Amino acid sequence: MVLNIWFNRWFSTVSHYMDMIRNNPDQQAFVIYGTHPNPDTVYFKKCDVSFIEPDSKGEEYLQFCLDFCRQHNIDIFVPRKENVLISQNLASFEAMGVKVLVCPDGELMALMDNKAAMYKSIEEHNETGHPIVTIPTYRVINNAEAFKDAYQELTSEGSRLCIKPVVGEGASGFRIIDDKADSISFLFNTATSPKISFATAYKILQKQVHFPDLMILEYLDGYEYSIDCLAGADGTLHIAIPRKKGKGRIREIEYNEELLVIAHRMADQYKIPFVFNIQVKYKDGVAKLLEINPRMSGGLHISCLASVNIPYYAIKLLLGGAIEVPRPTYGVKATYIEQPVILSKGSVLTKA
């Protein structure tokens, strides 16, 4: 049976996941659908069928998703955009027979989407005597004076600080507070940088009486790891693969017992199904949580060099299939290069 699978507004690296799903060990056939507002989206090259989707959000976008699934007889939907809202309306998709690769617990999805709420939840659990992972020192602020107070409090403890939105994805809004960012030498000798001085940040934040919740927290200066996880429908963890981010584009698949324990504790507590990603970073030898992403991560294809086809196994588990849990190949060091991709010359895609 050929299955129609749809990816909506993903990262460009979803191209790799499409390849892995298509080239699966069970020889399961798929027709891959892809949508994005940008007609030059690179992953359209990997799709059998592609459409330009509307640049909408919220309930309007949810309705688009439901209509698209109905019109194209979608069997499997792998959402990125509006995945929290989609999770909260899963019954509407299931009523059409559509399997959705998303955590079915809408409240848990909303919790993970809010970094401050997730931090608080983990802190409360840590206090029970069964710690999951260390949380960085942080404060949540929504006005300039609160930012100033939090900055003075945390710097008095000797911490370098950074800021990031409570609700956001990737590195959007992330800044390292460094007063050297206002110097002439920094201007002349530094390319694109996430650094911003306290004075500049404070001046910007003063432009509004209130702004969306922002976290100010200790900057973690050690190695960063992404732990890509595969779990069953009930949240039972099958595989966890720690991926170390080295200098530049160097990545290492590392057997790290401490991080594997964190992955198991997270899975035991929150029961996140199918596929998720835990990001941690070290400071003074302690791994501290950055965030949890209840979806395939942008760098999952690197983790799959451990000889585990996580995207396909996640789909198979979603469909109720059983998997033979493979043993990851640790010790892989990898990098990646830019590769030119010729887009279809003069092609015009149909709007969905």
Question: What is the meaning of each model-derived region?
Answer:
Residues 8, 72, 248-352:
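ATP-dependent carboxylate activation and anion-phosphoryl transfer catalytic cores
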Residues 167, 221, 294:
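Short, glycine/acidic-enriched loop or turn micro-motifs at the edges of active sites
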Residues 109-213:
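Active-site nucleotide/adenylate-binding loops and adjacent lid/helix of ATP-dependent enzymes
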Residues 2-6, 160, 215:
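Residues that mark the start of a beta-strand
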Residues 187-266, 270, 281-282, 286-288:
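Phosphate-binding site of ATP-dependent enzymes
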Residues 43-45, 61-63, 108-116, 171, ...:
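Short, charged, surface-exposed secondary-structure boundary motifs
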Residues 1-105:
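ATP-binding N-terminal substructure of ATP-dependent carboxylate-amine bond-forming enzymes
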